[in-house]
C-alpha cells in the first residue's frame, strides 16, 4: 500500500491555476496622420518568456509579446501584452520542468495574448492582425542549444 502511495506522488502533475493579463499597452504615436497613408505595414513580433517560482510546485510564467507596425517608415502602432499564468507543476525532472516552463506553458498562454493583441489593434481601428502560431518547442530547443554552446565555449576558454 505504501508503495502505491509513493508511486502516486511521483506521477507528473500539471494544473492551470489562473491565466491573466499582467500588463498591456497600445500606442499610435503618429495618429491621426498614419490613417491618411496607404496601408502597407511591416509588422515585427518580439517574444519573451520568463518564469518565477511562487511556492513549492507553483510557478508564474509570463509571455511578453511586442508587436510593432511600421508604415511608410513611421511607427503606425506599438502593442505590448504580457500574458501570465500560474501553474502547479510537480513530479517532473529538472529538464522536464524547464521544458514545461519554457515551452509548454507559453504555448498555453499564446492564444490569450494573440487575442489581446488582435483586440487592441482592432480598437485602434487598424486592419485585423492575425499572429501566426509560434512553435515554442523549437524556440526552447534553440535556447537550450545556445546555452550549451555558450557553456562549452566557456569551458574551452
Swiss-Prot record:
Q: List the disulfide bonds.
A: none
**What keywords were assigned to this record?**
Chaperone, Cytoplasm, Protein transport, Translocation, Transport
Q: Please give the chief subcellular localization of this protein.
A: cytoplasm
User: Where does the UniProt annotation locate this protein?
Assistant: Cytoplasm
Question: Signal peptide position in this chain?
Answer: none
A GO term (biological process) for this protein? protein tetramerization
Q: Which GO terms describe its cellular component?
A: cytoplasm
Short name of one Pfam family: SecB
**A GO term for molecular function:** unfolded protein binding
Under InterPro entries, the record lists: SecB, SecB-like_sf
Which residue windows are transmembrane per the record?
none
Return the similarity comment: Belongs to the SecB family.
Function per UniProt: One of the proteins required for the normal export of preproteins out of the cell cytoplasm. It is a molecular chaperone that binds to a subset of precursor proteins, maintaining them in a translocation-competent state. It also specifically binds to its receptor SecA.
Q: Could you describe the subunit structure of this protein? A: Homotetramer, a dimer of dimers. One homotetramer interacts with 1 SecA dimer.
This protein is called Protein-export protein SecB
Which source organism does the UniProt entry give? Shewanella oneidensis (strain ATCC 700550 / JCM 31522 / CIP 106686 / LMG 19005 / NCIMB 14063 / MR-1)
